[in-house]
Amino acid sequence: MEKKILEQLEFEKVKEQFWPYLQTEQGQLELDLLEPIANKDKIQAYFTELEEMAAIFVEHHHFALGGLSDVSESMQRLDLEADLSIQELLVIKKLLQVSAEVCRFYADLENVDLVALKALFEKIESFPSLQGSLQAINDAGFVEGFASPELESIRRQISNKEHASRQLLQDILKKQAAYLSESLIASRNGRSVLPVKNTYRHKVAGVVHDMSASGSTVYIEPRALVSLNEELTQLQADERHEIGRILHELSEQLRPHSRSLRNNAWLLGHLDLVRAKYLYMQAKQATVPVISDDKSLQLLNARHPLIQNPVANDLHFANDLAVIVITGPNTGGKTIMLKTLGLAQVMAQSGLPILADKGSRVAVFNGIYADIGDEQSIEQSLSTFSSHMTHIVEILNQADSDSLILFDELGAGTDPQEGASLAMAILEQLRLTNIKTMATTHYPELKAYGIETAYVENASMAFDNVSLKPTYRFMQGVPGRSNAFDIARRLGLAEHIVKEAQAMTATDHDVNRIIEQLEQQTLESRKRLEHIKEVEQDNLKFNRAVKKLYNEFSHAKDKELEKAALEAREIVDIALAESDSILSQLHEKAELKPHEIIEAKHRLKQLAPEQSLSQNKVLKQAKKWRAPRVGDDIIVTAYGQRGTLLAQLKDKRWEAQVGLIKLTLKEDEFSLVKLKEEAQQPKKRAVKVVKKAATGKGPRARLDLRGKRYEEAMQELDAFIDQALLNNMSQVDIIHGIGTGVIREAVGKYLRRNKHVKSFGYAPQNAGGSGCTIANLG
């Protein structure tokens, strides 16, 4: 990318706007080196990083890295086998700390899908061992005593010597107070001294280290203290030597990791720059543009980043459009619009967000060229025109169909007629070679060129005829018009002079009137578009409000369901605790009578919550599938028994075989059940209670008492009913025959007395009639 375009667009000033959002020197360095690139995939990767950083901030509003200084020079010193200073080690200590914090942050990161940033986060290494070693230096740069046993020992000796020195001085201070100018202990040349009056200097034996400016006081180190101070000085030298050894040891530990540390610093700096881009985007209401597959551009509400309170403008540069010519008078904002396009494109190709609305689109150009401003060269004795033309020639020689060219006041600085002709010829050459170009000019001849030439479009900047000031609103498709007559009239020029001037340029006046009508139509269209945008924004806000209400409702519903589930779990827990208590009571007894086990099982059954089968949604749904037919399997709603439909009677009544009993049922008294679905239902967990039985016989659903004596029949009946209850049988058959009726009556009396028998009756005629009793248990 040509360096001159960056200077003309003041790209460095734009980059300076990102400085307040940076936290690391490495990020600052990367920003300083940032320039536009022409690699579409690389630019898209930058944008993906930025979008993912936005996703991180949705979940973590205060994501930060902490201040980091540049470590590149320190790493070079490590590579050269040099030892690092305390300050350099502190910088690396901070780097290790931030690296560890970022690693932990990424490990805990949830609800954010990362692709581009994932690679960055996962490359950052943590060094807990090095981090632990560098704790020997605190944040103030003091090497802690625990850094080595030797340092700790030396400092303990220094402390003892200093204490002894102070004690000795205090004693001398008391004894020779009359000779002192002040009752205090001073320090000179790192030695503890006493301020002695000059007239008594020979009264205090010792070494003179200094004298006051007036000469009235001399600072003497008492002789008794000299040897003690010598020892202290030696210990302090030993301390410095030991600290140097510790710094060398720490440097040696860091040396093998210099490459990884340098890489960590770069990764953190890059993350910092991505973070700064996001914060800038939020603060400036910028956006990440879409990259076109062709050379088309679309800027929605684009703003110039270096202007305070800039006017936002739309720009549509279709793929087949080669040239846009902005015509009209000076000071209308033509150059600002030119630079707005250039900066948006340069920023985007540098991976930066642009000051425009969402939906904006940019292209990728191999070269962006501009001729903007007064380039007069005094040194080369070139006029403004010559300077511009020299630069234009260079641009034309370098540009191709993958270039974007920006011309400000093309053809200016020479004869207007010749300048206009040159401008048209240059634009025509660029149009024929399909090079995207935007040019500003005040030559009226170029308006006609823009109207008559294919793939060339006129544009202008709106002007307020009332205030006589430019509005800086970009009007694409409308050529600029002169406002000289209107301005002159409003400033007080005589009307007859204005009319005479208009008569001299009658044709131009007609053109201006047409242009004025186009301007009005454009402004009206823009107002309608702005109204549509306002409606869209209102709809968007409404949709967000509805979505928020829906989310709140869903959240409340989930909370209620969670509460209900919690209550259900509490009920189940209570039931399980009660069942465990019952089972514990059963297991505490070595021998249990059958009726005790039956009673316990009955209590366990009562723990289960009652459910009305008539309200069972699954069964209701099954019933709705189709009308019942003969042979269908059913469940009797009243007591949950399985049966089969035998025949359809009148009034929607059915005859059903339920066990050994035939029943007459209404259609709302049973539900259809599919065998396939029944097979797929999960089996219920059951608690098995094992009874010590006298025999090894299994459970029986039928008891035959024919030919039995009364006592024998009653014993077998009692054992049979107990066994049936233990095995959860709901229905049993008792065959007693007709005979004399003694056994039949005895069976009836027994069943009436047994509280676990719900009901009983004779079997149907085809199943034994009065010779067989069917008992329902529960």
UniProtKB/Swiss-Prot annotation:
Top-level enzyme category: hydrolase
InterPro entries per UniProt: DNA_mismatch_repair_MutS_C (IPR000432), DNA_mismatch_repair_MutS_core (IPR007696), DNA_mismatch_repair_MutS_sf (IPR036187), MSSS (IPR046893), MutS (IPR045076), MutS2 (IPR005747), P-loop_NTPase (IPR027417), Smr_dom (IPR002625)
Entry keyword DNA repair: no
Domain of life: Bacteria
EC number, UniProt record: 3.1.-.-, 3.6.4.-
One of the record's GO molecular function terms: mismatched DNA binding
Protein residues bound to ATP: G328, P329, N330, T331, G332, G333, K334, T335
SUPFAM superfamilies the UniProt entry points to: DNA repair protein MutS, domain III, P-loop containing nucleoside triphosphate hydrolases, SMR domain-like
Smr domain: residues covered: 703-778
Keyword check for Transport: no
Annotated keywords: ATP-binding, DNA-binding, Endonuclease, Hydrolase, Nuclease, Nucleotide-binding, RNA-binding, rRNA-binding
GO biological process, one term: negative regulation of DNA recombination
SMART domains named in the record: MUTSac, MUTSd, SMR
Function, as annotated: Endonuclease that is involved in the suppression of homologous recombination and thus may have a key role in the control of bacterial genetic diversity.
Family: Belongs to the DNA mismatch repair MutS family. MutS2 subfamily.
Subunit (UniProt): Homodimer. Binds to stalled ribosomes, contacting rRNA.
Protein name: Endonuclease MutS2
Species whose genome carries this gene: Streptococcus equi subsp. zooepidemicus (strain H70)
Top-level taxonomy: Bacteria, Bacillati, Bacillota, Bacilli, Lactobacillales
UniProt gene name: mutS2
